[in-house]
A protein has these predicted regions:
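Residues that define the transmembrane beta-barrel architecture of outer-membrane proteins
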Residues: 1, 30-35, 79-83, 120-126, ...
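Polar/charged side chains located within well-ordered beta-strands of beta-rich proteins
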Residues: 1, 9, 35, 89, ...
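Beta-barrel outer-membrane channel/assembly domains of diderm bacteria
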Residues: 1-49, 98-100, 131
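Residues on the lipid-exposed face of transmembrane beta-strands in outer-membrane beta-barrel proteins
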Residues: 1-2, 37-41, 85-89, 126-132, ...
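Transmembrane beta-strand segments that form the barrel wall of outer-membrane beta-barrel proteins
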Residues: 10-17, 52, 57-64, 70-72, ...
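Outer-membrane beta-barrel domain signature
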Residues: 22-29, 70-77, 111-119, 150-160, ...
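Internal, well-ordered domain-core segments that constitute the primary functional module
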Residues: 50-129
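Detector for outer-membrane/organellar transmembrane beta-barrel domains
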Residues: 95, 133-148, 156-245
């Protein structure tokens, strides 16, 4: 929607439904989920002439706009989602735009160490993220906190992480590795503590406080013939102390 003063607003709701039957009436087996419900505001007149002139404000429950994956094998490179608010496309300088967001997620119904049991077996996880673009380069920085997650009983004496750090350096190429027409993306991700689930930010509360992981993702697409494309991809990951064993 475009207002009289030129400001634009967009409202989105996304539903997901899980069923395990082929029948036409599935109400008894259906699991309906509101996956996204959020609003965006852009082209605000009060931002004219500032670094926020082309920015978009948002709030609600959503999948982050700048997530990306290898869609044909259904594998995320980076996925950030939850309930939150933020701003996209701040023009910090020439060839430098930045996104700032805060997301919240929940860890529910986890076992608690007996000596720390206060009757609470859930907590909220908060993610503060900044996503920066310098031409084709992307630098993403994330900090995570989940109060009392360290009271989670992991089973063998390790302490669950109640905080974490995560970073991703990515390059979005506009050719097939410089060899021909097409595109490619490469990303190097590293996380510690709650950030050690490097492709799903803040999604795993079972990570230990000593957890660390580094992941490399590379993929590209190009045409071998007018109706024939090739799309190679490579994943590699090294991790330590992610789970209590």
């Amino acid at each position: 929607h475009t207002a009289d003063n030129g400001a634009k607003s967009r409202f989105q709701v996304s539903f997901a439904d899980s069923v395990k039957t082929s029948n036409d009436w599935t109400a008894g087996q259906s699991n309906l989920n509101v996956r996204q419900v959020f609003v965006e505001l852009s082209d605000l007149p009060s931002f004219e002439g500032t670094a926020f002139a082309n920015s978009t404000l948002w709030g609600g429950k959503r999948l982050d706009r700048d997530n990306f994956d290898i869609h044909w094998i259904d594998s995320d490179v980076i996925k950030l989602a939850g309930l939150g608010a933020g701003i996209y496309d701040i023009e910090v300088a020439d060839q430098w735009t930045s996104n700032l967001s805060v997301y919240g997620r929940s860890f529910d119904d986890f076992p608690v160490i007996a000596r720390d049991d206060t009757g609470n077996d859930d907590t909220d996880s908060f993610i503060v993220t900044t996503n920066n673009y310098f031409g084709n380069w992307q630098l993403m920085l994330n900090a995570m906190s989940a109060a009392d997650n360290d009271t989670r009983d992991l089973g063998n004496g390790s302490t669950a992480a109640d905080s974490g750090l995560h970073t991703m350096l990515a390059y979005h190429g506009d050719s097939f590795f410089g060899l021909g027409e097409g595109n490619f993306k490469t990303a190097l991700l590293h996380g510690q503590g709650l950030g050690a689930e490097v492709k799903g930010l803040g999604a795993d509360g079972n990570l230990t406080e000593d957890a660390s992981a580094t992941r490399l993702a590379v993929y590209g697409t190009t045409y071998l013939a007018p109706q024939w494309r090739i799309a190679p991809s490579v994943f590699a990951e090294h991790s330590e102390d992610r789970y209590d064993e």
